[in-house]
Amino acid sequence: MPDICDSNKLNHRFRGYYPVVIDVETAGFNANTDALLEIAVTLLKMNDDGILVLDKTVHFHIEPFEGANLEPEALAFNGIDPTNPLRGAVSEKEAFLEIFKTVKKGQKASDCHRSIIVAHNAAFDLSFVNKAIERNDLKRSPFHPFASFDTATLAGLSIGHTVLAKACKMAGIDFDNKEAHSALYDTERTAELFCHIVNRWKALGGWPLATPEQSAIENTDEKIES
């Protein structure tokens, strides 16, 4: 169990996992058939006081993979035109190789042994990330293939709401609905929400965990008071 000093280090906070916040924008809900169109990745770090904060963000517009399905309803919802040359889109492979490089660098600097995806309704984002990695036969992914931190679940527990915009506002985080459904904007708001939840839990005394000796003393005090 980490001591009070170690608990302020990122590599001791999440069992050696390096949290990486991700948001994707897609051309549908099916990771097997629908195009991945945009991805943003926000790295996190802990300051000297053990407060989790945003570090840096990388962002890519993605070219639809060959034969990808483009659902008109999805494109109308996120406002993305995959054919627009001004997007500056790159291939899935190019984007993920750069993401791997950036994440591994941050993971190493934090002395963590693996990265774990943080996302709002994380199963959706994780499915598209995993399928893109598989489709491009990319090796040595830094990400855990199935474990994740879902901020929808965490926000529902800690704040009382699962919708990103409403959870952010309830947490005191500015959220502009006009900017929503951009991977870049949503990723950074999700990162702020995750940091808020983690830091609030620490402020309430939930972290670091009490040692067995401390727990024994607290239990004894409770018995005396009762």
Swiss-Prot record:
Keyword annotations from UniProtKB, A to Z: Exonuclease, Hydrolase, Magnesium, Metal-binding, Nuclease, tRNA processing
Binding site for Mg(2+) 2: 23, 25, 181, 186
Cofactor(s) named in the record: Mg(2+)
Boundaries of every Exonuclease domain copy: 20-194
EC number: 3.1.13.-
GO molecular function annotation: 3'-5' exonuclease activity; magnesium ion binding; nucleic acid binding; RNA exonuclease activity, producing 5'-phosphomonoesters
Pfam families, alphabetized: RNase_T
Site (Important for substrate binding and specificity): 29, 77, 124, 146
Cofactor, free-text remark: Binds two Mg(2+) per subunit. The active form of the enzyme binds two Mg(2+) ions in its active site. The first Mg(2+) forms only one salt bridge with the protein.
Active site: 181 (proton donor/acceptor)
Positions annotated to bind Mg(2+) 1: 23
GO cellular component labels: cytosol
Keyword Magnesium: yes
Enzyme class (EC, first level): hydrolase
GO annotation terms (biological process): DNA replication proofreading; tRNA processing
Subunit structure: Homodimer.
Record function comment: Trims short 3' overhangs of a variety of RNA species, leaving a one or two nucleotide 3' overhang. Responsible for the end-turnover of tRNA: specifically removes the terminal AMP residue from uncharged tRNA (tRNA-C-C-A). Also appears to be involved in tRNA biosynthesis.
Family: Belongs to the RNase T family.
PANTHER family reported for this sequence: DNA POLYMERASE III SUBUNIT EPSILON, RIBONUCLEASE T
Protein's name in the database: Ribonuclease T
Originating organism: Shewanella denitrificans (strain OS217 / ATCC BAA-1090 / DSM 15013)
